[in-house]
Design a protein with these regions (language model features):
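Short acidic DE-rich linear segments
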Residues: 139-141
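Active-site proximal helix-loop segment of RNase H-like, two-metal nucleases, encompassing DDE(D)
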Residues: 128-130
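RNase H catalytic domain
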Residues: 5, 9-13, 52-125, 134-137
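Loop-to-helix element that buttresses phosphate recognition and phosphoryl-transfer chemistry
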Residues: 46-50
């Protein structure tokens, strides 16, 4: 089974945003990915963009089972049908996730703390990306 840890964030909310993704199998990291996604991005949009990229990357490694691990309670609950998707931009991203799910036999979503080992690594990737784009952190590493 493939596991993904994805994280999206912005500095300012909205503000400059980036995503970070870890793709793993049997405890081994297969891929690390980060990308700057725009100047005026909300945290929720960044979280969805990160999940979309995580699903795209996972589909390179498997068409079978994938577990997507996120620290965004909102995204998880929307995907599980516990929260409605009201915002038009989030709805568009939600529908993209739904379409990407068709690439897999089984998909599972798991909410974890931002302090989870691999979640922290995904967070570091996105924050390093923002640093590299010239958007310095409000706090020291």
């Amino acid at each position: 089974m493939i596991y993904t840890n994805s994280d999206g964030g912005s500095r300012g909310n909205p503000g400059p945003g980036a995503i970070g993704i870890i793709v793993r199998k049997e405890g081994r990291i297969l891929q690390k990915y980060s990308k700057f996604i725009g100047e005026r991005v909300t945290n929720n949009i960044a979280e969805y963009e990160a999940l979309i990229k995580a699903l795209e990357l996972a589909s390179i490694h498997t068409k079978d089972e994938v577990t997507c691990i996120l620290d965004s309670e909102l995204v998880i609950k929307q995907l599980l049908g516990k929260y409605r998707v009201k915002h038009p931009t989030l709805l568009e991203l939600f529908l993209r996730v739904q379409k990407l799910q068709e690439n897999f036999k089984k998909i599972r979503y798991l909410h974890v703390s931002r302090w989870n080992k691999f979640q922290k690594l995904a967070d570091e990737l996105l924050n390093d990306e923002l640093d590299n784009q010239g958007y310095k952190r409000y706090y020291k590493k």
